Amino acid sequence: MASVQLQNVTKAWGEVVVSKDINLDIHEGEFVVFVGPSGCGKSTLLRMIAGLETITSGDLFIGEKRMNDTPPAERGVGMVFQSYALYPHLSVAENMSFGLKLAGAKKEVINQRVNQVAEVLQLAHLLDRKPKALSGGQRQRVAIGRTLVAEPSVFLLDEPLSNLDAALRVQMRIEISRLHKRLGRTMIYVTHDQVEAMTLADKIVVLDAGRVAQVGKPLELYHYPADRFVAGFIGSPKMNFLPVKVTSTAIDQVQVELPMPNRQQVWLPVESRDVQVGANMSLGIRPEHLLPSDIADVILEGEVQVVEQLGNETQIHIQIPSIRQNLVYRQNDVVLVEEGATFAIGLPPERCHLFREDGTACRRLHKEPGV
């Protein structure tokens, strides 16, 4: 195992900066996930750690050693790519041992490591098969096993589940989580799927246009996003946003006016520092935190546009006339409502988020479980 540290790391191609002043501390044995939309720089960051991309400025340390100029093979890292990249003419055992053979490892060492890793990955009964005889999930396990037998200090995974169908992704997600718990290796995992990030990570790094938007534990990012980008990216369905105007402030409270015909006002338990009366801000509320209207004091009303029945839950898209945008309301179980009907939902102030015009969040003061 080894720690990974990035100090003011920047990557640029000519005038185009793809990673800017990245500062990260990844501790020994942590499972860290880089997550963000396409083009945010997450794979480039992983490739700089692996040595497949040069660092324009800043420093990379693996353990205590500065690695900027160290060749990839000498960094003690192993990488699994989105593509399995298996040799079709070689067996599972031969694919897994290929790197060790090139490195000149002894046959006894190779056999021992391959057999140990095959047991961990439940591949022992498949060692003599060729890749064409394997399922997608089995091929990905072979690709992971090929990296594991090299015993890297840091394990890098670049969107390894993207080529799998939905059921296999869930299965492999569980297997990767179990693998990390069993081996205790430092793992850095890249994905655009925030569900993978939330379920796998000890720590999530959210990237936006080459910058680190926020670093934290999954529930911390979910309940206390640092800005509007993180709030909208983490969580599915995404957070609802309403334009509001500040009408008053107090210690640890901000009063805002909702965009409704009755100009209803509500006090939000958020940090009021630097919040000015009259400021235009955004109120955020997650679909699952909205309430049935009969148990709430603050009511929003609109017309049902779309009803998505998922069996275990219902997602209702409601158009609020005064803001000409849809809110998504999510409730467990089946909710029977017709499209075109008028529907009212409740807004719990303690579950609301408030964002300044520059997108930064006013710190929520409501204590959430698990954080």
Curated annotation (Swiss-Prot):
Residues 4-234 form the ABC transporter domain. Keywords: ATP-binding, Cell inner membrane, Cell membrane, Membrane, Nucleotide-binding, Sugar transport, Translocase, Transport. It comes from the Bacteria. The keyword Electron transport does not apply. GO terms for molecular function: ABC-type maltose transporter activity; ATP binding; ATP hydrolysis activity. It is found in: Cell inner membrane. Part of the ABC transporter complex MalEFGK involved in maltose/maltodextrin import. Responsible for energy coupling to the transport system. The complex is composed of two ATP-binding proteins (MalK), two transmembrane proteins (MalG and MalK) and a solute-binding protein (MalE). This is Maltose/maltodextrin import ATP-binding protein MalK. It comes from Escherichia coli O6:H1 (strain CFT073 / ATCC 700928 / UPEC).
